[in-house]
Amino acid sequence: MKIDVQLDGRPQKAAARARELAELGVDGLFTFEGPHDVFLPLVSAAGAVDVDLMTNVAIALPRSPMHLAHTAYDLQTLSRGRFRLGLGSQIRPHIEKRYGAEWSRPAARMREIVLAVKAIFDAWEGNSRLRFEGEFTTHTLMPPTFDPGPNPYGPPPICLGALGPVMTRTAAEVADGLLVMPFNSVRHYRERTLPAIEEGLDRAGRHAADLAIYPQVIVGTGRTPDELAAASRGVRSLLAFYGSTPAYRPVLDVEGWGDLQPELNALSKVGEYAAMAELIDDKMLTTLAVHGTPEECAAEIVERFGAYSDRVCCYFPGYPIRDGHIADLVAAVRELTP
């Protein structure tokens, strides 16, 4: 099993941190669309390390498929074939109020964006003329001046982030990979995610081998009591943030904790973030995340996801983690999955 970890998104830190993480033995690095651009750190990392790189995720709805295609194609070249384009839809308030973009039928739009980017790639690879005419976007013009030509490493795979059944089915129908959202549980994955994957593959006439599955897991790790307590606080805060979002309530519902979501949401609206974290008890912590020593976390990751995937994305949220603990976790996963 391969382990990907998050790259520091600050442009001035990305290359140096990429080298440090690569030396720890990680297999890949990913960025998320937070306080910094999601693509720029990977430009720096591509020239600094030889590990795999991925956006996890680039918010697709405010962007043109042509913009996404150009950036992904160039990152594929810079990374010498080690880039994956991870796309996500975000939720309505962010799309409308932060990005100032239109929100409607997110799964249908994401499906069309993935297909449009693939059509653009096919045109550049010389496989077909560009003629994509969809409901939301149209791309039918590609003069030679704007055509980069075939990529020496081939077009990058496109992964789609999903949690609910509709978006998960969409990913299984059209994407090369599924990024399983980190706010998840084993029960939700088995009862909700896997059936949606199978349904999407069946609809599209695809096979399991056509879709790479990348589970994402929230990790709280340390060795001393103080380190584990700090990790617990960081993880609880992130779980409370996710849990306050109505779109993520289905995960809580599966575990019988659905009534917690409106309580968390109400606290978030008045800025009571510390109180939100206090509502995440130990059972929730160990169900929705993994917590313990690096070796204990590695064993739990393999137990949860080893039967479904050979690659997992790990988050270490809101607490100072020692580089040695990352290296130990990666080494332990490799020992358990030779």
Where does each model-flagged region fall?
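Active-site-adjacent structural elements that line small-molecule/cofactor binding pockets in enzymes
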Residues: 1-338
